[in-house]
């Protein structure tokens, strides 16, 4: 109400912001676009007027974005294979538009570039008069190195490896940004050590209130996009190293599982695979599970599925790479030794998630993982 009155009578100056997104951020159905969509929503609710620019490659135009933005523009991503021959990373050179550049240059509003992917024009002279900020979602060359190590196909492995080298060199473009909003504490430490002007602004997400159910569930859940090599490896690890040693039931939920994963599931009577499943159905499984088990072997950025599990689920188990330096360690059962993982499973599977557990988990609502907290931090950085 206070914002409305001030805005109506021009008591405060309207804040306007260009956001350049690497993809159309709706539906908010994977890590990167979840952060972008709920950031846009939070900024809109805080009174920031957003001019959104989206690179598009296979996702539909999203009219819902117009509810939160004063203008929305779409730009076709250039997927020409000739771009692979350039020194600029393909994920960057394929997101380049003169029309976008001209629109950005036409006013004095600040710009938030979403990810290193969108930074091809960061140092362009046409926008040197503008305040420019970058939201980093990963240390991209580390992320691509991890993808390369996790990939079994030679052609993809080679692509990720070459892209990682190019991204490491391209990263220096960040010197042209007035500020960087790093998604994780580890990324923030790295960027500041490199001399970039970075602050930690954690991931934006769909959760505002803890919605965990008390009582017991009757299965353990692992969820993730199974087409991503990192998640495929984590699911196989659980099957081969943990659930082969216990009869506790496991559900693996996620689309596009590999043939190898399907074969492994068929060998384990206590494991079920749900692979034609919507986000809404996954959230229901997160809520119903007794334990959400989320290991990772790629400690980059912050895993939004961990936040989802903590806001919506009962007990959460993870390895140290999933939670290291996140501030979420105290809310999880953290273990790296597989024998102790099995012991913890058999202990917590029969425990009540009680009122005291629920109240303890509620601390997250008012922490650095709340959207309102991070929105204020971002506004302070940009304006």
Question: Which residues make up each language-model segment?
Answer:
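N-terminal subdomain of nucleotide-sugar transferases
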Residues: 2-70, 106-107, 244
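Acidic donor-binding loop of glycosyltransferase active sites
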Residues: 286-301, 312-314
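Short hydrophobic beta-strand element within catalytic cores of glycosyltransferases
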Residues: 305-311, 315-319
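A charged, aromatic-enriched C-terminal amphipathic alpha-helix characteristic of glycosyltransferases
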Residues: 95-98, 350-383
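Membrane-proximal helix-turn-helix segments that form the acceptor-binding/catalytic region
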Residues: 99-105, 139-143, 151-180
């Amino acid at each position: 109400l206070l914002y409305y009155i001030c805005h109506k009578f021009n008591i405060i100056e309207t804040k306007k912001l260009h956001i350049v997104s690497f993809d159309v951020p709706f539906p908010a159905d994977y890590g990167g676009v979840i952060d972008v969509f709920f950031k846009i929503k939070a900024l809109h609710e805080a009174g920031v007027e957003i001019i959104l620019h989206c690179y598009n490659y296979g996702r539909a135009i999203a009219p819902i974005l117009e509810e939160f933005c004063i203008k929305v523009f779409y730009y076709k991503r250039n997927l020409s294979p000739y771009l692979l021959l350039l020194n600029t990373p393909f994920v960057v050179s394929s997101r380049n538009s003169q029309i976008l550049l001209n629109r950005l240059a036409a006013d004095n509003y600040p710009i938030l570039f979403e990810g290193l992917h969108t930074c091809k024009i960061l140092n362009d002279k046409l926008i040197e008069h503008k305040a420019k900020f970058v939201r980093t979602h990963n240390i991209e060359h580390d992320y691509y190195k991890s993808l390369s190590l996790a990939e079994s196909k030679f052609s993809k492995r080679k692509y990720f490896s070459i892209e990682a080298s190019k991204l490491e060199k391209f990263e220096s473009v960040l010197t042209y940004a007035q500020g960087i909003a790093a998604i994780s504490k580890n990324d923030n430490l790295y960027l500041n050590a490199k001399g970039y002007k970075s602050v930690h602004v954690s991931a934006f997400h769909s959760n505002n209130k803890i919605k965990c159910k008390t009582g017991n569930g009757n299965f353990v859940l692992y969820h993730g996009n199974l087409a991503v090599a990192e998640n495929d490896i984590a699911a196989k690890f659980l099957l081969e190293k943990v659930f082969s040693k216990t009869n506790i039931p496991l559900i693996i939920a996620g689309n596009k599982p590999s043939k190898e994963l399907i074969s492994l599931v068929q060998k384990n009577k206590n494991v079920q695979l749900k692979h034609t499943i919507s986000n809404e159905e996954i959230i229901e499984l997160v809520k119903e599970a007794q334990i959400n088990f989320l290991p990772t072997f790629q400690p980059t950025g912050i895993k939004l599925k961990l936040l989802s599990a903590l806001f919506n689920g009962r007990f959460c188990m993870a390895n140290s790479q999933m939670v290291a330096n996140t501030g979420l360690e105290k809310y999880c059962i953290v273990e790296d030794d597989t024998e102790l993982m099995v012991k913890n499973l058999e202990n917590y599977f029969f425990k009540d998630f009680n009122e005291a557990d629920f109240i303890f988990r509620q601390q997250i609502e008012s922490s650095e993982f709340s959207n309102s907290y991070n929105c204020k931090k971002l506004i302070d950085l940009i304006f």
